[in-house]
Design a protein with these regions (language model features):
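Short, small-residue-biased leader/transition segments that mark boundaries at the very start
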Residues: 1-8
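Sequence-pattern detector for short linear motifs
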Residues: 5, 13, 75-77
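Generic signature of intrinsically disordered, low-complexity, basic-rich segments
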Residues: 8-9, 27
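Alpha-helical interaction segments
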Residues: 9-10, 153
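Acidic, Ala/Val/Gly-enriched low-complexity intrinsically disordered segments
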Residues: 12-18
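PLP-dependent amino-acid enzyme catalytic core
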Residues: 19-176
Length: 176
């Protein structure tokens, strides 16, 4: 696991009794080194309109300038970079209504890994087509994200794919 550190070993328990991993500055530095040269360097931009509306100095970070149009490429790319050769060889599966789907598809293509993305049937066509253009096998299923996520989990179990959770993963979050 390249750049992984001990992120899965440092865990705490939240109010619901669920375990979650604490991320450290070293984890973020490891992710940054993997992502260097992959993602666009997006600088903060002062927003006059939002500053006026809130009475504060507001700055925005234009992550829409990333190759996939969203910050989700950061987490997906970093997560896939930490997978073992065996996990990559099994192929990937995820569920998403758009931005995570494109991030996984792009990162998988860059790593030479096959990816299947399950998307709700209500996903905007531009996101479906972009995900396909990045090389993923897209399956449209269900009207809402939960339907797509259920099928993706079933495919991971039945086909042995490595499941890339769209948000509940400390490695993915470290990259984002």
């Amino acid at each position: 696991s390249r750049g992984l550190g001990d992120v899965y070993k440092r865990q705490a328990v939240n109010e619901e009794g669920e375990r979650w991993s604490m991320m450290t500055l070293e984890d973020f530095k490891a992710a940054r080194s993997v992502l260097a040269g992959v993602i666009a360097d997006t600088h903060l931009v002062h927003s006059v309109a939002f500053s006026k509306a809130t009475g504060n100095h507001v700055y925005i970070k234009p992550e829409n300038m990333q190759v996939t149009g969203a910050y989700k490429i950061r987490g997906a790319y970093y997560k896939i970079s930490t997978l073992s050769d065996e996990e990559k060889a099994r192929g990937l599966v995820t569920a998403s209504a758009g931005n995570h789907a494109q991030g996984v598809a792009y990162a998988a293509q860059a790593a030479g890994v096959k990816a299947t993305v399950v998307m709700p049937t209500t996903t905007p066509l531009v996101k479906v087509n972009n995900t396909k253009d990045y090389g993923a096998n897209v399956i449209l299923h269900g009207a809402v994200f939960d339907d797509a996520a259920e099928l993706a989990s079933q495919l991971a179990e039945a086909e042995g794919y490595t499941y890339i959770h769209p948000f509940n993963d400390p490695i993915l979050a470290t990259g984002q």
